[in-house]
C-alpha cells in the first residue's frame, strides 16, 4: 500500500488557523451561528477549530454540536456488516441560525446530503455552510461545494485521502493512500 503525505503537522496547523480566521471574518461573534461536526471524522476537526476560535481568537459562546449521519446515507445498506451509529449531540435550536457543517474530506457529496437531511429533524436554519479540510474536487456525485476549503486535492478514485489527528491517531497529518 503506497502512501504520500499531503500535509504535515505544521502545514495542517497553518491551514486550521486560516480556516479559523475565515470563520471569524464571516461570522464575527458567532451569536447567530452554530458549528456542527459531522460524525465521525469531522468532529475532531470541529473540536479543534472551536477550541482555536475560543482560545486563540477570543470567540465566546460558540454553540457546537455533533451530527451522526449513519442512517441518513443512501448507501448504508450496502455493507456486509451492521453499522454502528455515533452520537448526535445538538443541544441548541438551529431554527433561523447559520449552520456551519464541518467535515474532514469532501469526496462524492453523499455525506453532506445525508447531513442536510438529518439536520431537518432539528429545525430550519437560515443558512448552511460547509467547511472541509480536504476537497476532492473532481469526484463529486452531487452538486455540493464547500464554502471553506483547507486544501483542494486532485486524486483518482483508486486513491483515498486519510486525515490523522493526534487526539486519535498519534499525529496530525494527511496522506493520499492507494487502495488495494
Stretches found by the model and what they are:
Residues 1-32:
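Active-site-facing substrate-recognition patch
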Residues 30-51, 109:
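Charged, well-structured alpha/beta interaction segments
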Residues 32, 63, 98, 127-130:
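Residues at the starts of beta-strands that form the adenosine-phosphate
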Residues 20, 48-56, 118:
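Alpha-helical structural signal in soluble globular domains
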Residues 38, 69, 133-135:
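Cofactor-binding loop segments of dinucleotide-utilizing enzymes, especially the Rossmann-like FAD-
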Residues 90-120:
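Internal catalytic-core helix/loop-beta-alpha segment
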Residues 117-180:
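PRPP-dependent phosphoribosyltransferase catalytic core
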Residues 59-98:
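Short, glycine/charge-rich flexible loops or terminal/linker lids adjacent to PRPP-binding catalytic cores
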Amino acid at each position: 500500500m503506497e502512501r504520500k503525505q499531503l500535509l504535515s503537522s505544521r502545514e495542517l496547523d497553518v491551514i486550521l488557523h486560516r480556516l479559523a480566521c475565515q470563520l471569524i471574518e464571516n461570522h464575527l461573534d458567532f451569536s447567530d451561528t452554530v458549528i456542527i461536526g459531522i460524525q465521525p471524522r469531522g468532529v475532531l476537526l470541529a473540536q479543534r477549530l472551536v477550541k482555536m476560535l475560543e482560545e486563540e481568537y477570543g470567540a465566546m459562546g460558540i454553540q457546537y454540536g455533533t451530527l451522526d449521519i449513519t442512517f441518513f446515507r443512501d448507501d448504508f445498506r450496502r455493507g456486509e456488516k451492521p453499522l454502528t451509529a455515533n452520537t448526535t449531540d445538538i443541544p441548541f435550536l438551529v431554527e433561523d441560525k447559520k449552520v456551519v457543517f464541518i467535515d474532514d474530506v469532501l469526496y462524492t457529496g453523499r455525506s453532506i446530503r445525508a447531513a442536510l437531511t438529518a439536520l431537518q429533524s432539528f429545525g430550519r436554519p437560515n443558512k448552511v455552510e460547509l467547511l472541509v479540510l480536504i476537497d476532492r474536487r473532481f469526484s463529486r456525485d452531487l452538486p455540493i461545494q464547500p464554502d471553506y476549503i483547507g486544501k483542494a486535492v486532485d486524486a483518482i478514485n483508486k486513491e483515498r485521502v486519510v486525515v490523522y489527528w493526534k487526539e486519535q491517531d498519534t499525529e496530525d497529518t494527511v496522506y493520499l493512500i492507494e487502495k488495494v
